[in-house]
Amino acid sequence: MTTKNIAIIGECMIELSQKGADLNRGFGGDTLNTAVYISRQVKPDALDVHYVTALGTDSFSSEMMASWQKEGVKTDLIQRLDNKLPGLYFIETDATGERTFYYWRNDAAARYWLESPDADTISQQLAQFDYIYLSGISLAILNQASRARLLTVLRACRANGGKVIFDNNYRPRLWQSKEETRQAYSDMLACTDIAFLTLDDEDMLWGELPVDEVLKRTHGAGVMEVVIKRGADACLVSIQGEALLEVPAIKLPKEKVVDTTAAGDSFSAGYLSVRLNGGSAQDAAKRGHLTASTVIQYRGAIIPLEAMPA
């Protein structure tokens, strides 16, 4: 069997959080979470998982890469930029457990991965991949020229028989305006094969619409397979020309839910670990729910390896 490959594009940042008088340090990023959880759930000879970003030449960046390699995520497409650093965010938790996030990322290395001397070579390599996965955040951190260049890469990948997967993860503060985001998402969906959506993000960006209208709009943009993630509710899978699937989530007692930080990222990973290996959408959605329901029972985006579902 030929080993297929997936390139997951995005940004991973240094995470600082306060515990009493101490600061805890970790690493976090939506697409990185997905990369790790796919890597943990596929057989190594079935799918190679590559992460695509830019980092600095600092020790934090080196630690990040080492931790990804331990997870089986390939780092050969990651660039190290001399004059840049990874972004950073701080999580402040108040007495009620409510969290506030503060970001320092405006000049992070990841913003420049398509502007570096190696960008042409990496773009050519990406065009040969079986799958490319990215999120709304992967788009948001790029300038207009880099976004246009990325779309060219995605179109080339599809022309070569590859598939593009997009998660609509929308963070308004990363965009200049809704108009800019709508245009970028429309361009993106026009070259997407599988789209992961949450209705919260859809409503925030496009205005509230019934689910069937959201599906109609997304299919109309050119997407063949649309997966709507609905947290503790059943997910919906709509494949062009097939009956709508509704797959129930795994119900957990309230006291078991510890941290929903990476629920959506891990659902996508579970889904893709089955779907990209030839599994049905029904089985993929079940795996997505199982992965997410496991992850939210632990603190932090990346749970211990031994806690992963069988």
From Swiss-Prot:
- Identify the SUPFAM superfamilies for this entry: Ribokinase-like
Pathway it works in: Carbohydrate acid metabolism; 2-dehydro-3-deoxy-D-gluconate degradation; D-glyceraldehyde 3-phosphate and pyruvate from 2-dehydro-3-deoxy-D-gluconate: step 1/2
Reaction catalysed by this enzyme: 2-dehydro-3-deoxy-D-gluconate + ATP = 2-dehydro-3-deoxy-6-phospho-D-gluconate + ADP + H(+)
Task: Please list the GO biological process terms of this entry.
Answer: D-galacturonate catabolic process; D-glucuronate catabolic process; DNA damage response; phosphorylation
Family note: Belongs to the carbohydrate kinase PfkB family.
UniProt cross-references to PANTHER family, sorted A to Z: 2-DEHYDRO-3-DEOXYGLUCONOKINASE (PTHR43085:SF15), HEXOKINASE FAMILY MEMBER (PTHR43085)
Q: What's this protein's name?
A: 2-dehydro-3-deoxygluconokinase
Biological source species? Dickeya dadantii (strain 3937) (Erwinia chrysanthemi (strain 3937))
